[in-house]
Amino acid sequence: MGSSCRIECIFFSEFHPTLGPKITYQVPEDFISRELFDTVQVYIITKPELQNKLITVTAMEKKLIGCPVCIEHKKYSRNALLFNLGFVCDAQAKTCALEPIVKKLAGYLTTLELESSFVSTEESKQKLVPIMTILLEELNASGRCTLPIDESNTIHLKVIEQRPDPPVAQEYDVPVFTKDKEDFFNSQWDLTTQQILPYIDGFRHVQKISAEADVELNLVRIAIQNLLYYGVVTLVSILQYSNVYCPTPKVQDLVDDKSLQEACLSYVTKEGHKRASLRDVFQLYCSLSPGTTVRDLIGRHPQQLQHVDERKLIQFGLMKNLIRRLQKYPVRVSRDERSHPARLYTGCHSYDEICCKTGMSYQELDERLENDPNIIICWK
């Protein structure tokens, strides 16, 4: 499990009929000081309105996550059993991924108590110490844990890392599969996604996919955003031979990383051709520069491109951040209304976006802007 949510301590707290709230067990021992527990105990053994709810509290540079449980029955002292099995992490840790684990453990212990008085019986309750020890070690080591409680009960737990929100898929973005396309043609996806999958080829942009698949644009964007979330696709810009690219510092990884070399050469070699050489591919990437279009690259390096598919060369470079696109952004420098559509000429909208929104081709847009003295082009 990532260090961002490493568990420093697991504790079991309960309400004692005479002593009140107390920590019965903790692993490692004495991790939670008396001062810390006194500060947070009202959130560990709580009032009824907070029971059976996930609670995260930060105090004294520690973050405690728990789910206080209350089981009411006349067999218990004061007619209720109150307990909490929780985790302690660093105050700065991102603990969202641990919350479902804490909630699930609270549910398991509640079930075990209702079925066999596991928590309220001293003999069985003592089994919590080795259980907590295994939990701490295995969740920190691998993010998953299997806990045999008794002959008929086993608990399976897994930390599901929270993925960041994917970027918004714009109509001018081009989705590219991150793995073999054929792996994803199955019924695990919703109907909209199944309908657009055949049109994702790494070259069609979102708007074109929408038109050719006959699916409403916003539905296509939502479906692609879902694929982005699960890492099935990534986004690159529209490929045209007038595009300009330049290498990033990561292009050096192509020399140092053997697995990246293998993936790159397999990806960019023309179908049915002899395998491309690393020397040729690296030279092609390094030949990209401001002012050099893809068309220029093809004209200057026919020998190196004998076995290299230039479209896949660009595509792979963008996917792996070996290269980046330099895009043109029109900026209107006066209020002349002839600069229509003026709202798109602010320096914030690329040629890709403007062409998708207006239906103009790159050539048409270029001709229009070249003849407009009130427009300058910013490359970035």
Curated annotation (Swiss-Prot):
InterPro entries: NPR2-like
Record cross-link Glycyl lysine isopeptide (Lys-Gly) (interchain with G-Cter in ubiquitin), residues: 158, 357
Subunit structure: Within the GATOR complex, component of the GATOR1 subcomplex, made of DEPDC5, NPRL2 and NPRL3. GATOR1 mediates the strong interaction of the GATOR complex with small GTPases Rag (RagA/RRAGA, RagB/RRAGB, RagC/RRAGC and/or RagD/RRAGD) heterodimers. GATOR1 interacts with GPR155/LYCHOS; interaction takes place in presence of cholesterol and prevents interaction between GATOR1 and KICSTOR. Interacts with PDPK1.
PTM entry text: In the presence of abundant amino acids, ubiquitinated at Lys-158 and Lys-357 via 'Lys-6'-linked ubiquitination by the WDR24 component of the GATOR2 complex, thereby inhibiting the GATOR1 complex and promoting mTORC1 activation. Asymmetric dimethylation at Arg-78 by PRMT1 inhibits the GTPase activator activity of the GATOR1 complex and consequently inducing timely mTORC1 activation under methionine-sufficient conditions.
Top-rank lineage group of the source organism: Eukaryota
UniProt function note: Catalytic component of the GATOR1 complex, a multiprotein complex that functions as an inhibitor of the amino acid-sensing branch of the mTORC1 pathway. In response to amino acid depletion, the GATOR1 complex has GTPase activating protein (GAP) activity and strongly increases GTP hydrolysis by RagA/RRAGA (or RagB/RRAGB) within heterodimeric Rag complexes, thereby turning them into their inactive GDP-bound form, releasing mTORC1 from lysosomal surface and inhibiting mTORC1 signaling. In the presence of abundant amino acids, the GATOR1 complex is ubiquitinated and inhibited by GATOR2. Suppresses Src-dependent tyrosine phosphorylation and activation of PDPK1 and its downstream signaling. Down-regulates PDPK1 kinase activity by interfering with tyrosine phosphorylation at 'Tyr-9', 'Tyr-373' and 'Tyr-376' residues. May act as a tumor suppressor. Suppresses cell growth and enhances sensitivity to various anticancer drugs.
Broad class of where this protein is predominantly found: membrane
Native organism: Bos taurus
Region called Interaction with PDPK1, residue ranges: 1-133
Protein name as annotated: GATOR1 complex protein NPRL2
